[in-house]
Structure formats: structure tokens, C-alpha cells
Amino acid sequence: MSQAVQTNGTQPLSKTWELSLYELQRTPQEAITDGLEIVVSPRSLHSELMCPICLDMLKNTMTTKECLHRFCADCIITALRSGNKECPTCRKKLVSKRSLRPDPNFDALISKIYPSRDEYEAHQERVLARINKHNNQQALSHSIEEGLKIQAMNRLQRGKKQQIENGSGAEDNGDSSHCSNASTHSNQEAGPSNKRTKTSDDSGLEPDNNNAAMAIDPVMDGASEIELVFRPHPTLMEKDDSAQTRYIKTSGNATVDHLSKYLAVRLALEELRSKGESNQMNLDTASEKQYTIYIATASGQFTVLNGSFSLELVSEKYWKVNKPMELYYAPTKEHK
């Protein structure tokens, strides 16, 4: 393929280039005109929506003008201030913030894919706050424990040193009475020292116990347990043996989908036991999509819960009272 280019001169110059095999074979994609919808999992888009610096979802997206790579505004500005005047992805030269431009369209796309992002970020901040609180408490407890152990060892060494010095002084004088008094004095000095050492050792064991308790508490604290009263929906659930109130205690990090899957497996297992069957096919086909979880609002209406919501988030958003949370279940219409 050739192209004639007119220059300022009297005769045109011809420019020739060769097409690659891809360029020769490629065809335009056909436009979708029949209303077909293509479902794409948000997880498959994570690499496209992730900031290469913080490895989290892009926030206040900034795009480089030269190479068009995207970063969080805070991340790329911090990187430029630290002295690395280059793109973290391709190492292309970036002079300053003037080499960046905001990308509100990409932020709008992310908010369209993840409409509940604010709730997700609030949950992440709460989890990080719990982890930081536990780490600070554990570091303080460990520091106190080590300090008590060092103090106990120093007291013990001082007591032994005083015994040796008093004993050697008595031998040099050769006075038996003085030796007796010195040994008595040494024992008296060593006695309180040993007592103090023992007390310190005893007190040193207390942080161990507290530390052991703290080693368990953060796990419980990071995933605080939530008590549930799981009732059948008063209008959508048929009155049969499976329609009974269930009482559950589980982790606050469990999602509504986990609850639906548990309910499906539980009811399938109860059905097998009632029929006396041993076929496990019903358990394998149990899905979280079989049941829909509801919560009653203040207006007396039932709100369908998003399957990705954690129970802790549901409690903070809808329940807000210090008593077991009441949820309702009913078969999903597509699975009836």
C-alpha cells in the first residue's frame, strides 16, 4: 500500500509501508443489535480496575497523558513526590502532576460495576481498625512481659552477687562471729530478693495468661459473632415441617449467601433423613440461589438482602438493636 504525500516542493513524495499479517486478516467486529446481554463476572475485571501501586480498586482515578496508565490519585501523587518521576508501570518519564489528568468516566464505570463500594470500604476500614487495635495491644502486652522478665533476672543476679561478696568478706576476716552475722545478713538480703523475684515471676505469668486470652479475642473480635433468629417468611413460605424457626450463631463476616447455602443444605439433609435415603445428590445440588433472605424494616415491609452483604453489615444497616437479629427466608421464585 502506498500513499502520495504533497510537500512544499513541486513533486509529491510517495510513502510505502507493509501491512502485518494481523492487519491483513483482521475484520471489524459486528455490532450487537438484537439486545443480547453478555454477563461478565466483576472478579474477572479486577485486574483492569486495580491500581498497580496499592493493588486495590482505583479511587479518584488519574491517567498519565503519555502512556495512559491509570492509578489512584493519592498513590501516583505520592510516588511522584518521593522522587520517582516515572510511570510505575512502564517507566515512562513523568515530569510532575501536570503529566496526569483525572478520569471521571472511569470512576463512573467503577461505581456502576460496584454500586455498594462505600459500604465495602467502610467494612474494610473497620476490619483494619480491629487488626491495628489487636496488634497494638499485643505489642504492649509483650513489652510488659519482657520487661518483667528482665527485672526478675536482674534482681536474681544482684542477690547472687551480694551473697558472693558477703561470703568472700567473711573468709578474709576470719572472724567466725562476723562470718555468722554476715551470712545472716546475706540471707536476710537474699530472702526479700528471692521473694521479690518470685513475685515478679508470678506477675510475669499474668501477662502470659492475658496474652493467651488476647490471642483468642482478636479472632473473635475480627469476626464478631452474631446471633440470628431465622424465621420462615409469613406469606411466601408454605406451612410444612421445613417451615420452622431456627436459631443460629455465626461469624459476622459470613455473608447472606453463606446463610442461604447453609439453609439449602440443612433442609436437603432433613429431607433425606425424613425419607430414610442415603443419596447425597440433593446435598451436592444445594445452592445459595434456592432461598432468598429478607429482613423486616421499621415500616413493616420485608426487604430482600443482597447476597454479598456480610451479616455484620446487615446488622449495622438494618437492625441497630442489641438483641438477636431476626431474618426471614423463603424459596426463590425461580427455584420453586
Swiss-Prot record:
Cellular component per GO, a single term? ubiquitin ligase complex
Residues annotated as region Interaction with nucleosomes via an acidic patch on histone H2A and histone H2B? 93-98
SUPFAM superfamilies documented for this protein: RING/U-box
Per UniProt, the enzyme's principal EC class comes to: transferase
Q: Where is this cross-link: Glycyl lysine isopeptide (Lys-Gly) (interchain with G-Cter in SUMO2)?
A: K249, K323
Q: Pfam families attached here?
A: RAWUL (PF16207), zf-C3HC4_2 (PF13923)
Keywords tagged on the record = Acetylation, Chromosome, Cytoplasm, Isopeptide bond, Metal-binding, Nucleus, Phosphoprotein, Repressor, Transcription, Transcription regulation, Transferase, Ubl conjugation, Ubl conjugation pathway, Zinc, Zinc-finger
MF GO annotations: chromatin binding; histone H2AK119 ubiquitin ligase activity; ubiquitin protein ligase activity; zinc ion binding
PROSITE patterns the UniProt entry points to: ZF_RING_1 (PS00518), ZF_RING_2 (PS50089)
Give the record's pathway. Protein modification; protein ubiquitination
PANTHER family in the cross-refs: E3 UBIQUITIN-PROTEIN LIGASE RING1 / RING 2 FAMILY MEMBER (PTHR46076), E3 UBIQUITIN-PROTEIN LIGASE RING2 (PTHR46076:SF4)
* Stated name of the protein: E3 ubiquitin-protein ligase RING2
Q: Could you tell me which species this protein originates from?
A: Pongo abelii (Sumatran orangutan)
Query: What gene does the UniProt entry assign to this protein?
Result: RNF2
